[in-house]
């Protein structure tokens, strides 16, 4: 099964047999903005303070940098850190949408290796659920799949992602797609309805409190021969730098995390952790006796 969007270029549209989606349609509808406002609000720039709109599920955020939002209160406990993702409002809804529309070719390429009919697919730390979005916009109308999304409970980009995926399922009449919404709690990791056959955790691990606990929870719920797509961004920072949402606790576990990955998975892609530390890799779960 291969996934190939008709026009995955920077200025293109996404055409399905049922509907044509313009580049920022979902943001424009959910947040009542123009395409120009969507692009401006989601384009990364140093020191920027976008005026982010509110929605039915969040308040507006304006005159603050990303760093200002992080520094607005202490971020010492799991609850403090999770609150950051609520405090940022629609910031990640816009930023991640703009970024991942530019990564559409990559989505297509990796999903060819991860997706087949009848599987239970999980997008962990999903943000706006870009990989799940690509699946739903690319699959045949009769395609059978369970999709589970997980992110911080109650954060705006997670709520936006849920709305977006449900809208695509309804628009396209995807009757054989089952969507499962599994939030991550400050002191509780999600449990899934079925064994996970394929999981994506993309640009997430550097933000989680404990990558090792996260991986353990995932491994315990994976099917034999399950596939894992991951990356774990490594920043070169001074010891006393404020890492913000790139958590020190996550960075401290990076080495042991990859030891655990190599003990439990076989690397399928040709980019090792040593040669390409910030690369995106695909692994297959080992079947242990």
Model-predicted segments: where are they?
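Conserved N-terminal segment of class I S-adenosyl-L-methionine
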Residues: 2-192, 215, 229-287
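A conserved beta-strand element that flanks and buttresses the S-adenosyl-L-methionine
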Residues: 200
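Di-metal (Zn2+ and/or Mg2+/Mn2+) metal-binding site signature of metallo-dependent hydrolases
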Residues: 207-211
């Amino acid at each position: 099964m291969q996934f190939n969007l008709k026009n995955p270029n920077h200025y293109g549209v996404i055409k399905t047999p049922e509907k044509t989606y313009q580049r920022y349609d979902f943001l424009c509808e959910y947040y009542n903005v123009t395409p120009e406002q969507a692009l401006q609000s989601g384009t990364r720039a140093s020191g920027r303070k976008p005026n982010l709109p509110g929605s039915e599920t969040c308040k507006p955020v304006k005159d603050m940098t990303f760093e200002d939002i992080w520094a607005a209160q202490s971020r010492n406990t799991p609850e403090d850190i999770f609150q950051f993702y609520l405090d940022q409002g629609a910031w990640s809804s816009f930023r991640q949408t703009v970024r991942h529309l530019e990564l559409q070719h990559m989505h297509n390429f990796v999903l060819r290796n991860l997706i087949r009919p009848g599987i239970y697919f999980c997008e962990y730390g999903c943000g706006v659920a870009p990989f799940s979005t690509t699946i739903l916009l690319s699959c045949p109308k009769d395609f059978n799949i369970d999709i589970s999304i997980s992110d911080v409970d109650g954060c705006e980009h997670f709520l936006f992602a849920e709305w977006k995926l449900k809208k695509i399922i309804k628009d396209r009449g995807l009757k054989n797609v089952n969507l499962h919404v599994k939030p991550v709690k400050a002191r509780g990791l999600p449990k899934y309805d079925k064994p996970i056959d394929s999981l994506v955790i993309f640009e997430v691990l550097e933000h989680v409190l404990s990558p090792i606990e996260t991986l353990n929870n995932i491994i315990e719920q994976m099917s034999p021969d399950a596939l894992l797509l991951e990356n774990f961004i490594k920043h070169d920072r001074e010891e006393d730098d404020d890492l913000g949402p790139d958590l020190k606790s996550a960075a401290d576990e990076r080495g042991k995390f990859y030891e655990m990955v190599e003990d439990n998975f076989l690397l399928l892609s040709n980019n090792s952790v040593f040669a390409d530390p910030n690369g995106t890799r695909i692994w297959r779960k080992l079947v242990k006796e």
